[in-house]
Amino acid sequence: MRSSLTLVGTFWAFLSLVTAVASSTSYFLPYWLFGSQLGKPVSFSTFRRCNYPVRGDGHNLIMVEECGRYASFAAIPSLAWQMCTVVTGAGCALLLLVALAAVLGCCMEELISRMMGRCMGAAQFVGGLLISSGCALYPLGWNSPEVMQTCGNVSNQFQLGTCRLGWAYYCAGGGAAAAMLICTWLSCFAGRNPKPVMLVENIMRNTNSYAMELDHCLKP
């Protein structure tokens, strides 16, 4: 089974898969921001949270120690995080789509040409740019009441207070940077140029097919 990718293209497909999985996994994991509330550790992503306060029987706040997403899109603490959720999700979807096509190119001949590889690299650049934009928007939501309660009531936009950034935030940003800088460059050398003989064969095959169809139509 021949591949439609060069040796560089095979490495590009592998790296594309790694960056897409890293960014997408980080997007879904609620470990972008770490803080504490009522003596319990709390962590956030853009649309998920681990450990949250609820009213107990005595109207006292108690911490529920579990992870989950917000009940609705409108329940996400800030407009910045809502935008971050949409933008980052779109970027991850684009990177996953390109990575899937790149992996298929390792197994299928004539799937990815030199020009197609460059177009896929451009799509990776856009996907990485979207995820990077989401990472840049994320600090704009640190002034929401929910985040401030977790960060010692001293957090603000681009000010963490007592909180700290989590590994998932760095992983998402790193995956986006690798997709934009490395994968986009490697994609320029990923696809194979079609062989002239194969081009001639395809042209002749198509010409014969059209001739047979025309002959069939002209017969009474």
Swiss-Prot record:
Keyword Signal assigned: yes
Per the UniProt entry, the glycosylated residues are 153
Q: How far does the signal peptide extend, from start to end residue?
A: 1-23
List the InterPro entries hit by this protein, alphabetically.
Answer: LHFPL
Give the record's GO CC terms.
membrane
Answer whether the UniProt record assigns the keyword Glycoprotein to this protein: yes
Q: Which domain of life is it from?
A: Eukaryota
Give the record's keywords alphabetically.
Glycoprotein, Membrane, Signal, Transmembrane, Transmembrane helix
**Topology class, membrane:** Multi-pass membrane protein
User: Where can this protein be found?
Assistant: Membrane
Q: Where are the transmembrane segments?
A: 86-106, 122-142, 165-185
As for family, the record states:
Belongs to the LHFP family.
UniProt protein name: LHFPL tetraspan subfamily member 1 protein
As recorded in Swiss-Prot or TrEMBL, the protein's gene is named: Lhfpl1
